Amino acid sequence: MKINLLSICLFILLIIPSLLFSQRGETGDKVFSNRFPPDVLNYFSEASLEIKNTVEHDIIVLIRDQYRKYVRHVYIRNGERFTLKNLPITRIYVQFKSLEFYFEDKKVSVINFGEKNIFTFFYDASMEGNYFKISEEEFFKP
């Protein structure tokens, strides 16, 4: 009886942590790849964008070009960073999903040949600041 109880307790202790984290993606995942067209890559530009997530929750970042067409998206866990490489040379708009809301950065960034750019999410986007709220439809348009 003691062996069965010990086995059950050990089993529960091993299963619970995996269940808690099983629904959470990994940084770099393409969680909405079925809702967007293929990623836009430019292997000759050598341009990159490092995205740092310093807020207390995970985010999904979406990059759009100067015509607001889809370029790339990525899932980033809180406290982590991810670098998007081989970006096209263009002006970019940064949109993101934070908790259950969708936002866009008010600033337009320029990606030039060979540049290494950095974008940092430094506080909760639902607070007033450099972001404005967008609809789910705007976020998921191709």
Protein language model features and the residues they cover:
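Bacterial N-terminal signal peptides that target proteins for export
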Residues: M1-C9
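Short beta-strand segments within Ig-like beta-sandwich modules, predominantly Fibronectin type-III
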Residues: R72-I76
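Short Pro-Gly-centered beta-turn/loop motif in secreted/extracellular proteins
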Residues: T83-R91
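Primarily secretory-pathway and cell-envelope proteins
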Residues: Q23-Y67, S98-P142
